[in-house]
């Protein structure tokens, strides 16, 4: 076992740098625990507010004997022109704060450098979120290998890699509405330019930030991916080849959460009592409930949320609907009560205003479908739980994930969203799916057609394969061993 090697010879010390956004931090904290379980000393570097979000989960891990510590660094908000209190990506109230936020984040280079000068034992490896390009300079200065974590699947990472190598494909498009086929791909897949992460050119400082991110990607030692070989074998193999073998699939990392409290508080403390939620689910028939959650960042316009709600109502199926960013959705709260919606659906609709215990909900036998924004964490959690997906992508890697789920894996149904809803620009888009479209998509997913039955069967099989992948001898478990052996050899050769 690698844990024995690390104790007997050279003690491995990994320093983890999560990006300050829920969807990025959640899997990084899981990765910290997975590595610590193998005897690796872990130091997580983050800001005070972000450290507080994961205090309970990490405290339990540390109390259980895992060698994890957290080092807090203050975000230089004022120096970057960022108003105080904006320590997380999901707390930003406008697009105008995006560049100052990234500036502040990358100004952490100097205090982090001082940390590394004093760190003991000397770090053997950095694992950094791809949104933190300054960590490449730290890695170079201290001669430490840097492993990138993108938080995306191999399908998406390979797509981005292919398009970077074949820039003329995007350059030759006449408009953002025009579709193109991704070349050299295991499956025939079409996108428009805005549907691919980091493919749209934005001039000015944001372009410079993106270029720094791309450059840092090129200079990294390798990549870890929160996926498993059996889920997307062709894409995992091709991406590993593209990275000269230095790509390790180690997921689903969420499966390290075995304790009920860890599942319930994954990412944040839930805004509903866990027992109340489970009691409600217990009262519903097996496979009858649709779980609806569109992520921690997006706030769809009121007009679209109303159509979604009315579609859920007309589907006549029990549902749990999570509405996040609640402060921004006061108008929706008013509509819930004034229109009579909340009263009409009270017997079969559970509304969670804030953060939900998503892993616990998806694992419950009464849940039979998941309407998701297709963020990779949620997508993978749904598949891992054996739940078919109703896809409603918004931006970023989410359209890639939809293509994988619907076209390649055939475990999901599209809600019909083709247009990208850029973060902060939701009002410009308006209604993309009306209530009839919602009702129809829900029926297609949750109904008893042959296609629906086949989807359910297929996703259950993929869920079982996920469990096997993380067990000892499984593909992801073995890949963590391989990664640690690789870093161990590097560490020993450097000493």
From Swiss-Prot:
The keyword Glycosyltransferase belongs to this UniProt entry's keyword annotation: yes
List of residues binding an anthocyanidin: 24, 396
GO biological process terms on file: saponin metabolic process
Top-rank EC class of the record's enzyme: transferase
Activity-pH behavior: Optimum pH is 8.6.
Pfam hit, one: UDPGT
E.C. code: 2.4.1.368
Active site: 24 (proton acceptor), 129 (charge relay)
Record keywords: Glycosyltransferase, Transferase
Cited function: The monoglucosylated hederagenin 3-O-beta-D-glucoside is a feeding deterrent of the yellow-striped flea beetle (Phyllotreta nemorum).
Family of this protein: Belongs to the UDP-glycosyltransferase family.
Protein name per its UniProtKB record: UDP-glycosyltransferase 73C11
């Amino acid at each position: 076992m690698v844990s024995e090697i690390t104790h007997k010879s050279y003690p491995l010390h990994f320093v983890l740098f999560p990006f300050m956004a829920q969807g990025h931090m959640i899997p990084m904290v899981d990765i910290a625990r997975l590595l610590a379980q193998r005897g690796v000393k872990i130091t997580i570097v983050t800001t005070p507010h972000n450290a507080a979000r994961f205090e309970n989960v990490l405290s339990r891990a540390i109390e259980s004997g895992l060698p994890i510590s957290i080092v807090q660094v203050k975000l230089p908000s004022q120096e970057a022109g960022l108003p105080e209190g904006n320590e997380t990506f999901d707390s930003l109230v406008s697009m105008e704060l995006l560049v100052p936020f990234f500036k502040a984040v990358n100004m952490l280079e100097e205090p982090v450098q001082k940390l590394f000068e004093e760190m003991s034992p000397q770090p053997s490896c950095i694992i950094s979120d791809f949104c933190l390009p300054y960590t490449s300079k730290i890695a170079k200065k201290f001669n430490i290998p840097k492993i990138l974590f993108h938080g995306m699947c191999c399908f998406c990472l390979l797509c981005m890699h292919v398009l970077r190598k074949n820039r003329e494909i995007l350059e030759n498009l006449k408009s953002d509405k025009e579709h193109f086929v991704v070349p050299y791909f295991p499956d025939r897949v079409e996108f428009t330019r805005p549907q691919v992460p980091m493919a749209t050119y934005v001039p000015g400082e944001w372009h410079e930030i993106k270029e720094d991110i791309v450059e840092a990607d090129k200079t990294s030692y390798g990549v870890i991916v929160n996926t498993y070989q059996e889920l997307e074998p062709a894409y995992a193999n091709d991406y590993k080849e593209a990275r000269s073998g230095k790509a390790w699939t180690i997921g689903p990392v969420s499966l390290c959460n075995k304790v009920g409290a860890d599942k319930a508080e994954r990412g944040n403390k839930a805004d509903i009592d866990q027992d109340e939620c489970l009691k409600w689910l217990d009262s519903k028939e097996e496979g009858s409930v649709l779980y609806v959650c569109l992520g921690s960042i997006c706030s769809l316009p009121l007009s679209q949320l109303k159509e979604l709600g009315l579609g859920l109502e007309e589907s006549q199926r029990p549902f749990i609907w999570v509405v996040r960013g609640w402060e921004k959705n006061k108008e929706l709260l008013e509509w819930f009560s004034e229109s009579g919606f909340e009263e009409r659906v009270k017997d079969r609709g559970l509304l969670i205003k804030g953060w939900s215990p998503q892993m616990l909900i998806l694992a419950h036998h009464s849940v039979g479908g998941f309407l998701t924004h297709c963020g990779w964490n949620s997508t993978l959690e749904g598949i891992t739980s054996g739940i078919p997906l109703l896809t409603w992508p918004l931006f970023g890697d989410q359209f890639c994930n939809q293509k994988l789920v619907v076209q390649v894996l055939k475990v999901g149904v599209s809600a019909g969203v083709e247009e990208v809803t850029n973060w902060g620009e939701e009002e410009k888009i308006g209604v993309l799916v009306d209530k009839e479209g919602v009702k129809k998509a829900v029926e297609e997913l949750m109904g008893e057609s042959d296609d629906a039955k086949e989807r359910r069967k297929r996703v259950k099989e993929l869920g079982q394969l996920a469990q096997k992948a993380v067990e000892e001898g499984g593909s992801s478990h073995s890949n963590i061993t391989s990664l640690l052996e690789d870093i161990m050899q590097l560490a020993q050769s450097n000493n």
